[in-house]
């Protein structure tokens, strides 16, 4: 009987404490980003802020010319620049170990979780405007390394109307 009363008391205490300090949930905010130059295009990039859950999807990469046909390895990196500090958001690498080549065009991957962007002091896309970059580093069959950089342009998809 005493165990039952203790269990009921603990349950009531836990239920009461979970309601205390409840804050209003942040509204869903969705942004798209893209960037391009003569050689590369990044498109369909998405950033989602949904309370503490954040999603960063790099979108797709399209190589515009034949200079990317002899690539044996490459890495892609999304990052922000704050002062002289480079803060990596998402980075992926691909290498062919058979002596062949790899295609740089395609899906750039994604990352999600609690504080995916806030861990690098990003609370809003205002912190990303003008500071979000994409970098492609390639190595060809002759061992020549090239680095390509694009600045991303952000567009808000959802409008925050306070509801």
Question: Predicted regions: what is each one?
Answer:
Residues 91-142:
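Short, solvent-exposed, Trp/other aromatic-anchored flexible loops in extracytoplasmic proteins
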Residues 58-60, 75, 131-135, 149-151:
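Beta-strand secondary-structure signal
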Residues 81-83, 139-141, 157:
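Short coil/turn motifs at secondary-structure junctions
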Residues 16-19:
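C-terminal motif of bacterial Sec signal peptides marking the signal peptidase cleavage site
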Residues 21-99:
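N-terminal export/targeting and maturation segments
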Residues 144-163:
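Short beta-strand elements
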Residues 3-10:
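Sec-dependent signal peptide recognition
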């Amino acid at each position: 009987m005493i165990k039952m009363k203790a269990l009921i008391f603990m349950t009531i205490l836990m239920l009461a404490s979970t309601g205390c300090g409840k804050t209003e949930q942040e509204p869903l905010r969705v942004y798209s980003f893209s960037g391009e130059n003569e050689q590369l295009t990044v498109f369909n990039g998405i950033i989602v802020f949904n309370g503490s859950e954040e999603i960063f999807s790099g979108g797709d990469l399209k190589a515009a010319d034949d200079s990317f046909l002899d690539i044996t390895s490459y890495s892609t990196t999304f990052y922000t620049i704050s002062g002289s500090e480079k803060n990596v958001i998402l980075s992926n690498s691909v290498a062919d170990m058979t002596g062949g080549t790899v295609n740089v065009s395609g899906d750039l991957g994604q990352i999600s979780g609690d504080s995916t962007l806030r861990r690098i002091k990003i609370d809003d896309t205002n912190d990303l405007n003008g500071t979000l970059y994409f970098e492609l580093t390639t190595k060809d069959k002759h061992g020549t390394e090239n680095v390509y950089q694009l600045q991303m342009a952000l567009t808000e998809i959802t409008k925050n109307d306070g509801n």
